Amino acid sequence: MNATDLKLYLVTHRYDDNEATFLAKIAAACENSVTMVQLREKMLSTRAYFELAQRVKLITDRYQIPLIIDDRVDICLAVDAAGVHIGDDELPVAMTRQLIGPDKVLGVSTKTVETAVAAVAAGADYLGVGAIFPTQTKANAAVTPIATLKAITAQVAVPVVAIGGVKEANLATFKDTGIAGVAIVSEIMQAPDIAHKVQALRTKLKAVLPNDR
């Protein structure tokens, strides 16, 4: 896997923002040191997704932050993103690895130790585990217990990122879980002051992540 910092992983969501506002939010988050950005767009046409990904990559490249594309291997390759993140409904992990090659980052969503171990064996570079807390972004997502998160981090040799309802107020929950970082959606994308929120999250994470001192 490419040298990748997963500490504060922004996963985008458009909500009701127009494109200019959406891009400005991503830029503010990057300027204030999120460490990775995942572009997640479920409703756009392929052409629209490609064009948006190009614009987002201009921002992430400016700040030298890796861009990960959610689900779409074709979009990842078309814009030369750093990698792709897949879930249960996408291509199998091994097939995705074959398509993107050995050098791009492959993230995989998982909820159990068994699927986590299988994903790593098939070529995953990092795992996204959750939803740890209830989340409006994926309202029907089953909650993954902290005990399961700890069991996964203990069983796999790749970095694990906690996702789902993660907020500044609950970051302390992740102390001593073995995670490499947290993936955050609404806490950043809907923050009234994104710069302040990202800085506050980075400060709180220093007390939570053993590699963030």
Swiss-Prot record:
Keyword match Oxidoreductase: no
Cofactor needs: Mg(2+)
Coiled-coil ranges per UniProt: none
List of residues binding 2-[(2R,5Z)-2-carboxy-4-methylthiazol-5(2H)-ylidene]ethyl phosphate: 135-137, 165, 185-186
EC number(s) on file: 2.5.1.3
Residue positions binding Mg(2+): 71, 90
GO terms (BP aspect): thiamine biosynthetic process; thiamine diphosphate biosynthetic process
Highest rank taxon of the organism: Bacteria
Pfam families named in the record: TMP-TENI
Pathway the protein takes part in: Cofactor biosynthesis; thiamine diphosphate biosynthesis; thiamine phosphate from 4-amino-2-methyl-5-diphosphomethylpyrimidine and 4-methyl-5-(2-phosphoethyl)-thiazole: step 1/1
Cofactor note: Binds 1 Mg(2+) ion per subunit.
Keywords: Magnesium, Metal-binding, Thiamine biosynthesis, Transferase
Record keyword Magnesium present: yes
GO CC terms, sorted: cytoplasm
Catalysed reaction, written as an equation: 2-[(2R,5Z)-2-carboxy-4-methylthiazol-5(2H)-ylidene]ethyl phosphate + 4-amino-2-methyl-5-(diphosphooxymethyl)pyrimidine + 2 H(+) = thiamine phosphate + CO2 + diphosphate; 2-(2-carboxy-4-methylthiazol-5-yl)ethyl phosphate + 4-amino-2-methyl-5-(diphosphooxymethyl)pyrimidine + 2 H(+) = thiamine phosphate + CO2 + diphosphate; 4-methyl-5-(2-phosphooxyethyl)-thiazole + 4-amino-2-methyl-5-(diphosphooxymethyl)pyrimidine + H(+) = thiamine phosphate + diphosphate
Molecular function as annotated in GO: magnesium ion binding; thiamine-phosphate diphosphorylase activity
Principal EC category: transferase
Entry binding sites for 4-amino-2-methyl-5-(diphosphooxymethyl)pyrimidine: 38-42, 70, 109, 138
Functional description taken from the UniProt entry: Condenses 4-methyl-5-(beta-hydroxyethyl)thiazole monophosphate (THZ-P) and 2-methyl-4-amino-5-hydroxymethyl pyrimidine pyrophosphate (HMP-PP) to form thiamine monophosphate (TMP).
Family: Belongs to the thiamine-phosphate synthase family.
Protein name from the UniProt record: Thiamine-phosphate synthase
Upper classification of the organism: Bacteria, Bacillati, Bacillota, Bacilli, Lactobacillales
